[in-house]
């Protein structure tokens, strides 16, 4: 049920920005291949590790290999807390942007982050109402 890494490159277009690797039922995606493809094409990798809690790939916890790791806390996931989730960031350069997203662009704990917001839109990462 995981992404077929042999089909990723043929799906990449000039509009592609990220590769999303969803680890299902604790089975890891082929992350070495995915990371190599992403590097070659200048893409980021987002790991959906909500179903990969406590699982690993070559000794590394799922959700910590790509540029970002995501964990859902929805009631159907391994860690059920009703709603919400967690974001793992492997590059401190994204910390400020993550703070803006966490606050849905309404407020931010860092005042410089608030000043950096210039527009809001449905497809912008700073949308006031997150798309679900």
Enumerate the language-model features and the residues they cover.
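Active-site region of PLP-dependent enzymes
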Residues: 52-58, 65-132
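Loop/helix-junction capping segments adjacent to catalytic residues or to phosphate/diphosphate-binding pockets
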Residues: 2, 28, 79
């Amino acid at each position: 049920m995981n992404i077929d890494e042999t089909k990723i490159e043929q799906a990449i277009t000039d509009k592609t920005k990220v590769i999303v690797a969803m680890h299902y039922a604790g089975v890891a995606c082929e992350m070495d291949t995915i990371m190599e493809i992403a590097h070659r094409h200048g893409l980021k990798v987002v790991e959906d590790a909500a179903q990969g809690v406590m699982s690993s790939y070559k000794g590394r916890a799922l959700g910590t290999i790509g540029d970002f790791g995501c964990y859902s806390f929805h009631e159907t996931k391994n860690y059920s807390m009703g709603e919400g989730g967690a974001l793992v960031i492997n590059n401190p350069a994204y910390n400020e942007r993550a703070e803006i997203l966490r606050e849905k662009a309404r407020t931010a704990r860092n005042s410089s982050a608030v000043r950096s917001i210039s527009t809001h839109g449905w497809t912008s990462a700073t949308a006031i109402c997150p798309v679900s």
